[in-house]
Every structure is written in structure tokens, then in C-alpha cells.
Amino acid sequence: MAPRTLLLLLAAALAPTQTRAGPHSLRYFVTAVSRPGLGKPRYMEVGYVDNTEFVRFDSDAENPRMKPRVRWMEQEGPEYWEQETQNAKDHEQSFRVSLRNLLGYYNQSKGGSHTIQGMRGCDVGSDWRLLRGYEQFAYDGPDYIALNEDLKTWTAADMAAQITRRKWEQAGAAETLRAYLEGACVEWLRRYLELGNATLLCTDPPKAHVTHHPRSEGKVTLRCWALGFYPADITLTWQLNGEELTQDMELVETRPAGDGTFQKWAALVVPLGKEQNYTCHVEHEGLPEPLTLRWEPPPSTDSYMVIVAVLVVLGAVFIIGAVVAFVMMMRRNTGGKGGDYTLAPGSQSSEMSLRDCKVMVHDSHSLA
């Protein structure tokens, strides 16, 4: 892989801007996929601020350009987008070269499809100093090479990656990258947080509930869901009598929901009939205090029957009352003489009463 693969992002710094400090991150993910016989490799570059996708470039687009993925990035002017698009196209060309080089490093034929994936970014603390810098690549899935936490050395995964490591060491690539991570990366992050302040610095608390899934051998799975939360950091734990069951539970990675929020679940297998002894605990900065949830069994069939019976009785009482009220009203209108009230030819009293009852029920409901 050529050293040019390091040139994934902008290197220009912006003047510092003021925004609420705190742990924040700026990450760029890149993917290059060769496809022999189908044209040039596809290249994609996606940027995230605090787990929110904010820019994207796709070489397969009808008009390949770096484009905003959130409204607040539309505040950037044409010069910004022209520069970002040109940077992405330069990166695309660099990755084409890298794909060819790696074929030679691994002694692979030109007929197969291969993939390079990369990530670069920075995490900052409440004082806006760098907490952690990242630069890492994978080839056809497994790790290839990564910048170490000291921001000075590299970890190469195999003999082929050693070739790249030596080239980058000779070129002083780590020093250049460290300057970017400690400087421009932090300033760009500050800039983006200022633009997206109303969205990125708000919180959406999770909507949490527990579901129940029967298993064999007298066991059930309790799954604790947290949905619709932002930012992505959240803690889900299962407890039994106050003791955390971290080793026994299945915890999935936090996933984007597609609407700017996130979702996550934690599952635990428990004995049938003992579900109420287990509690799920949810911690998120959008919550005034942590949530504690148990599985709530649905009402029994007997309870449903009682509810239905009560509703039927109430309905019958209401209908009878409406019919009586109608008859009383008609009697008053005829001076109390029932003989003046006659049915339409061919009608039956029960049908007429039922129709009028329906009208009265509808009208009274509308006036409520």
C-alpha cells in the first residue's frame, strides 16, 4: 500500500469556535472494492460526528461528489464541497493503486474482487485535547495495519503489512498523521459541532421495554430493548437480586435506527416462572435517572373475559337507557298518548329502536 493512502482527510485547520465541551468524536470510514471486468473499483467515504453520518462520497453515483447527509452541513459554502470532492477523488485514485499493490504483496491473481477498508479519526475530551487518534486498515476482512495508541508506531498484521509499515516508517507517516490528529482533526470536529449544535448536542432518552421469548427445557429468554435514543452511548445490564449478570447476558452492538437515533438490546436466559426476579437497568444521559424494568406478563384469559363481560353489560345498559329516553321523549311530544305514534309500513319495532339508538349514541359521542 502506498503512503498516499494516509491522505484521506483535509489537513487545513480552522479557527477555533466555541461550543459545549465534552467527549466527542470525528471518524471517517473508507471502502474500496475492486471488480475486475466491471470497470474501476468502487470507492466510498463516509464521515461521522458523534456517530451521526454527516457527509458521504460514492464513486458510483451519477455525479460523484462529497454530499451532506444532514441539514446543518448545508451551511457550508460551495468552496468547501468542491475541496472535499476533490480530496475524495484523490483518495479514490490512491486506493486504486493500493489495491494493485496488495495483489502483488499477497501474490494474488487479477481476476478476483478484493476490498480495502479504513478508518481514521479523533476522540476529544472535555478540555478539547486529543484522547485517542485512529488510523487502521483491513484487507479482505482481516486487519492489515493500524496506528498504535502512542501515535508513533504501527502494528502490522502479517508479512505483507510489514512491507507497508517499513515504507510508512521511512516516509515519517506517523509524524504527519499525529500532527493532523492533534490539530486539524480536533479543529474540524469543533467546527462541525458548532454547525450541528442544535442536533448533535441534544439528547433523546431511550424508550425501553422487556420482551418474553419461550425456549425449550423450562427456560425463557428475556430481552431488554432500548430504542430511539441519542447519543449512542448507553448501558444495558441485567441483574438478579442486585447482582449484575454481565457474563451471562447477550449484548448486541449499538445500531443506528435510520432516523438519527440508535437502538440496542440485552438478552438473558432465565428459568421459566422466575422472570420477575430479574431486572433490566438502563443508563443514558438523556434519562433523569436510570430505568429499572421487569417483564410484565400480559393479563390472563380470565381477566380478559371479565373485562369483556363488563363491557357487554355496560353496553346493554346504555342501549336500554337510550331506548327508554327516546320512548319517553316521543310520549311527551304526543301528549303522553302512545296511540299517536305509529311505525312505518313494513317496519318492526326492534329494528326502528335499534336504528334510533345508534343515531343517539353517535350524536351523544360527537357532543362529548
UniProtKB/Swiss-Prot annotation:
Stretches in topological domain Cytoplasmic: 331-368
Topology with respect to the bilayer: Single-pass type I membrane protein
Membrane-spanning intervals of the chain: 304-330
Extracellular face residues: 22-303
GO cellular component: external side of plasma membrane; lumenal side of endoplasmic reticulum membrane; MHC class I protein complex; phagocytic vesicle membrane; plasma membrane
Region (Alpha-2): 112-203
Keywords: Disulfide bond, Glycoprotein, Immunity, Membrane, MHC I, Phosphoprotein, Signal, Transmembrane, Transmembrane helix
Sugar-modified residues: 107, 197, 277
Any one Gene Ontology BP term: antigen processing and presentation of endogenous peptide antigen via MHC class I via ER pathway, TAP-dependent
Signal peptide positions (record): 1-21
Phosphoprotein recorded as keyword: yes
Alphabetical list of Pfam families matching this protein: C1-set, MHC_I, MHC_I_C
Function: Involved in the presentation of foreign antigens to the immune system.
Stated family: Belongs to the MHC class I family.
Name of the protein in its database record: H-2 class I histocompatibility antigen, D-P alpha chain
Upper classification of the organism: Eukaryota, Metazoa, Chordata, Craniata, Vertebrata
